[in-house]
C-alpha cells in the first residue's frame, strides 16, 4: 500500500510510503495553488506522471524526470489563457427543513462584496446520484460563466452521492419537490450572503440538472428569472428504462424516481426557458425536450435547440462545446426574462 485517497470537497491523497510522500509533497510545493495528483510512475520512480488543476486551470499533465526536472506534456484545454477565472469555496447552508446542504460557490476572480451582488446561476449537477468536486469543472461551464461575470452555486442537493448516506437517501421520491427546495434555498442563501442579486437569478442544468431547470419553469414560487435546461428529463412517467442499462439499478433505484412531474404541471409554467439537446442523445431522448416545449411555448417565452450530431455524454466534439456555450451566453444576454441579463 502506497497511500489512500479520501473523497472530500476534492480528492485528497495521503501517501504512507515515504518516497511517494516525499515526491508528492515536493510537487505540491512547486504547484501550491493547484491540486496535484500522481497518475503513474515507473520502477525506481525516475519517471513520475502527474496532473495539476485548479478551479481556474484545466488539467495539465507533467512528467517528473529523475526527481529534479519537470517536463509539461500538455493540457486538456490549451486555448484557455493562464490567468485566474474563479474564486471558489466549499460551503454549507440550511434547507428549509433543517437538512445541511453542501455546495460549491464560484465567483469571478477578484470580486469583493463591496462590488455589489452578482447575477447568479444555480447549477445543479446531473445524476442525480452523483456530486461535484472543487477544482476544475470538467464541463467547463463554471469557469465560462464566472469569466462572464456570473456567480455560480453548485448545490449538492439531497440525493447526491458521496456526501453521506443521510443526504443521499433524503432524495428518494423527491424529484421536483424537496430536491428542488434545496436549489431554491441555496439561491436564497446566496442572496442573504450578499453574493447574488435576487432579480438576476438563473437555473442552468444538464441531464438531471436539466430536469431541475424544467421543474423550476412550472414551480409556482420559483425565484429564477429564466431556466436553461440541457438534455432534460421532463416526463417521469415515461422515464422508464432509458436512464440506465443496468437492470438491477433500474429495478431497485428506479423505485425512488418519483415526485413532481414537470409534464403534468405545465399549466403553472411561468418562467422563460431555453431547452437544448443533442439529436444523438439516447439517455435523455430529444422527445423529452420537444414535448415539454410544445406544452409551455404558449404560456412562457420558450426556445428549443437540437444540437447536430451531439450525444448525451462528454467528451463532445470541440464544435459542440463552442455551439452550446454561445447558445447559453446569447440566451442569458438577450432572452433571460424580459431583456436578458449580463454578467459583465
Residue ranges, per PLM feature:
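Short beta-strand immediately N-terminal to the catalytic nucleophile in serine-hydrolase-like folds
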Residues: 203-205, 230, 276
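Conserved alpha/beta-hydrolase "acid-adjacent" motif
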Residues: 282-290
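Short beta-strand/loop motif that positions the catalytic acidic residue
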Residues: 269, 275-277, 281
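Non-catalytic accessory segments flanking enzyme active sites
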Residues: 4, 11-111, 133, 137-140, ...
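Cap/lid segment of the alpha/beta-hydrolase catalytic domain
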Residues: 79-199, 206-207, 212, 239-242
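C-terminal catalytic histidine-bearing segment of alpha/beta-hydrolase fold enzymes
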Residues: 290, 297-344
Amino acid at each position: 500500500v502506497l497511500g489512500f485517497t479520501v473523497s472530500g470537497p476534492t480528492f485528497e491523497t495521503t501517501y504512507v510510503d515515504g518516497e511517494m510522500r516525499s515526491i508528492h509533497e515536493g510537487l505540491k510545493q512547486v504547484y501550491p495553488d493547484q491540486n496535484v495528483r500522481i497518475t503513474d510512475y515507473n520502477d525506481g520512480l525516475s519517471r513520475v506522471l502527474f496532473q495539476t488543476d485548479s478551479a481556474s486551470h484545466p488539467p495539465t499533465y507533467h512528467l517528473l524526470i529523475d526527481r529534479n526536472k519537470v517536463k509539461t506534456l500538455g493540457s486538456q484545454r490549451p486555448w484557455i489563457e493562464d490567468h485566474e477565472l474563479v474564486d471558489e469555496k466549499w460551503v454549507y447552508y440550511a434547507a428549509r427543513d433543517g437538512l445541511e446542504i453542501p455546495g460549491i460557490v464560484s465567483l469571478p476572480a477578484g470580486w469583493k462584496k463591496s462590488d455589489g451582488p452578482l447575477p447568479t446561476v444555480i447549477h445543479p449537477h446531473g445524476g442525480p446520484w452523483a456530486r461535484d468536486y472543487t477544482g476544475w469543472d470538467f464541463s467547463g461551464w463554471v469557469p465560462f460563466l464566472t469569466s462572464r461575470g456570473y456567480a455560480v452555486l453548485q448545490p449538492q442537493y439531497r440525493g447526491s452521492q458521496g456526501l453521506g448516506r443521510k443526504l443521499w437517501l433524503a432524495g428518494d421520491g423527491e424529484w421536483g419537490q424537496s430536491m428542488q427546495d434545496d436549489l431554491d434555498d441555496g439561491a436564497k442563501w446566496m442572496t442573504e450572503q450578499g453574493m447574488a442579486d435576487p432579480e438576476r437569478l438563473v437555473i442552468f442544468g444538464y441531464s438531471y440538472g436539466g430536469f431541475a431547470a424544467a421543474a423550476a419553469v412550472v414551480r409556482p414560487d420559483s425565484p429564477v428569472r429564466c431556466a436553461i435546461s440541457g438534455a432534460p428529463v421532463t416526463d417521469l412517467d415515461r422515464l422508464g428504462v432509458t436512464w440506465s442499462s443496468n437492470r438491477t439499478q433500474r429495478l431497485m433505484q428506479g423505485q425512488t424516481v418519483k415526485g413532481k412531474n414537470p409534464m403534468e404541471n405545465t399549466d403553472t409554467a411561468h418562467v422563460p426557458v431555453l431547452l437544448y439537446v443533442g439529436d444523438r442523445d439516447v439517455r435523455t431522448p430529444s422527445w423529452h425536450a420537444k414535448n415539454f416545449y410544445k406544452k409551455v411555448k404558449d404560456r412562457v417565452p420558450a426556445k428549443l435547440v437540437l444540437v447536430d450530431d451531439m450525444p448525451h455524454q462528454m467528451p463532445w466534439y470541440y464544435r459542440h462545446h463552442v455551439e452550446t456555450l454561445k447558445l447559453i451566453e446569447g440566451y442569458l444576454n438577450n432572452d433571460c426574462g424580459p431583456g436578458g441579463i449580463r454578467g459583465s
